[in-house]
Amino acid sequence: FPTRRSSDLEVARVLHQKIGRVSYVDTIVCMDGTEVIGAFLAEEFEKEDMASTNRHETIYVVSPEMNSNNQLLFRDNIKPSIAGKHVILLSASTTTGKTIHRSLEGIRYYGGVIEAVASVFSTVSEMDGFAVHSVFHAEDLPGYAAYSADDCPFCKKGIKLDAVVNGFGYSKL
């Protein structure tokens, strides 16, 4: 997705407000191309009198890779920004919560301490014991629906998809 500085800044401000006070933030793990929002979110937290275990007292903003099993992969140069660090997970869109679940598993695997979960859009309010703080919800999009392939009423009727949407954008078919 192309990004607009002003929109990303406003989303970061709203997410910061929704997350509220967090004692420690060392790292923001950005999924789905949310690095610009993540940088602004880090800036919002740094304005507070917030503690960090980072020596330089600034927040890391990192993005993982995904392996062939859709598991998070942090390279050796990124691992120190996760291991033993207080982490906020940030995603663009959360529909089922599966990506958040896998991401939380991955962050824990690499030794991170999850402090908060945020998503620009989410139909899920909680995942693995963490509130999912979001700017937009399903109620904000009249007629919004998401289905698994097995339960899709359009698929059952043979109605073809118009487009595919993911973290990179949408493509008409």
What do these predicted regions represent?
Residues F1-S6:
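Short, small-residue-biased leader/transition segments that mark boundaries at the very start
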Residues I19, F45-D49, I107, G111:
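Active-site catalytic pocket residues across diverse enzymes, especially alpha/beta-hydrolases
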Residues R21-T34:
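Short glycine-rich phosphate-binding loop at a beta-alpha junction
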Residues C30, L89-L90:
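Hydrophobic Val/Ile/Leu positions in short beta-strands of Rossmann-like dinucleotide-binding domains
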Residues T94-I107:
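A phosphate-binding catalytic loop at a beta-strand-loop-alpha-helix junction
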